[in-house]
């Protein structure tokens, strides 16, 4: 079964990477329009959630952009961890977790470098840190679950 699961896992990972690339390729004006539309939807729906202290309602648009980074990189982290798990053999879980995290970090840094060349956009180290806040816990969660399953089986 794992033999056939690795191709869809890779396809999902590449699809998420493509979505990130397309969104990062948007000029500043279009990117701002999209995030403002999401912000207006959030404000209109009056979603009540438990949010961290740094989440300020006065600057909701900036926070929507930060959370978008976290969510999309969380998805990338999970899919990358699953893909690495399915494709690599004879490698420890720790090494796989480190590789999945490193690949996500490289993609996040590359994404910021790419944005440097997009009109009106800038490369920011803070965005890479925010991206890491998305993928690191998710990669860790995948490998903690795999570790726990292995411990229960033995």
What label would you give each PLM region?
Residues 1-80:
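"…centered on the first transmembrane helix and the immediately adjacent amphipathic helix/loop
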Residues 2-5, 87-94:
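Membrane-interface helix-boundary motifs at transmembrane edges
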Residues 5-12, 95-103, 126, 130:
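Alpha-helical transmembrane segments of integral membrane proteins
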Residues 15-20, 96-116:
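Small-polar-interrupted transmembrane alpha-helices in polytopic inner-membrane proteins
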Residues 73-87, 133-149:
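Membrane-interfacial alpha-helical segments at the cytosolic side of multi-pass membrane proteins
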Residues 108-132:
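Interfacial helix-loop-helix junctions of multi-pass membrane proteins
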Residues 151-154:
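Short, charged juxtamembrane terminal tails flanking transmembrane helices
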């Amino acid at each position: 079964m794992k033999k056939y699961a690795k191709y869809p896992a890779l396809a999902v990972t590449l699809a998420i990477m493509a979505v990130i690339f397309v969104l990062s390729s948007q000029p500043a004006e279009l990117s701002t329009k999209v995030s403002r539309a999401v912000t207006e939807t959030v404000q209109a729906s009056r979603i009540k959630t438990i949010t961290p202290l740094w989440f300020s309602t006065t600057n909701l648009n900036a926070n929507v952009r930060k959370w978008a980074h976290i969510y999309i990189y969380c998805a990338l982290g999970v899919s990358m961890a699953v893909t690495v798990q399915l494709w690599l053999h004879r490698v420890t879980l720790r090494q796989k977790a480190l590789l999945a995290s490193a690949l996500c970090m490289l993609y996040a840094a590359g994404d910021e470098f790419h944005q440097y060349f997009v009109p009106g956009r800038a490369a920011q180290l803070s965005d890479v840190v925010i991206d890491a806040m998305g993928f690191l816990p998710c990669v860790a969660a995948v490998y903690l679950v795999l570790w726990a399953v292995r411990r229960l089986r033995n």
